[in-house]
Design a protein with these regions (language model features):
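Acidic, small-residue rich beta-repeat scaffolds with periodic aromatic anchors
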Residues: 4-5, 20-43, 105-147
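Hydrophobic helical h-region of N-terminal Sec-dependent signal peptides
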Residues: 6-10
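N-terminal signal peptide c-region/cleavage motif recognized by signal peptidases
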Residues: 13-16
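Signature of short aromatic-glycine-proline-rich micro-motifs recurring in repeat-based ectodomains
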Residues: 46-54
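Short, surface-exposed coil-to-beta transition loops
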Residues: 50, 86-88, 103, 129-134
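Acidic/hydrophobic-patterned starts of short beta strands in beta-sheet-rich repeat architectures
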Residues: 58-71, 112-120
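Short, conserved, GDST-rich strand-edge loop motifs in beta-rich repeat architectures
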Residues: 72-83, 126
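Beta-propeller blade signature
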Residues: 88-95
């Protein structure tokens, strides 16, 4: 009986990891790759914050998608490994796909129940060199963006 109970618990834990962990695995791989890149550059020491991976339900299906924010990375031997004047890398993991962006800042806002990712991007993305430029991104029946 104990063996059956133990097997059931292991199976339940494993199934939740597989079902709910698909994006987590991708997010973790992104962070691990960054850690490896840091270490390979003059033996750098890699650090992240608790805000490195955040959860947001962009598709409205009740299952949160993940954002991996490289502005939360630091490497002791490089100040600009994951960004520069164009912004810092931001990865959004939706439906098994990784969307990569550069952004100076970002925020998720709710517009009538729809989660919208706002990115403050380099002004050249708005075809000029003056003032702020923003992108609004939504994932509803696919991926859409506007600048």
């Amino acid at each position: 009986m104990k063996a059956i109970l133990f097997a059931s618990i292991v199976l339940l834990c494993f199934s939740s990891t597989v079902i709910g962990g698909e994006h987590l695995t991708i997010a973790t791989e992104i962070v691990q790759k960054a850690k490896s890149e840091c270490a390979s550059f003059e033996g750098g020491k890699f650090n992240t914050t608790e805000q490195t991976i955040t959860l947001h339900d962009f598709t409205g299906d009740g299952r949160p998608e993940e954002i991996v924010d490289a502005s939360q990375f630091s490497c002791s031997t490089s100040a600009s490994m994951w960004g520069g004047s164009g912004g810092t890398f931001l990865w959004v993991l939706v439906d098994g796909k990784t969307h990569e962006f550069l952004a100076h800042k970002w925020r998720v806002v709710d517009v009538d129940g729809q989660k919208v990712l706002l990115l403050a991007v380099h002004s050249s993305e708005c075809s000029d060199t003056l003032g702020p430029c923003y992108r609004a991104l939504v994932w509803s029946d696919g991926f859409r963006t506007i600048r």
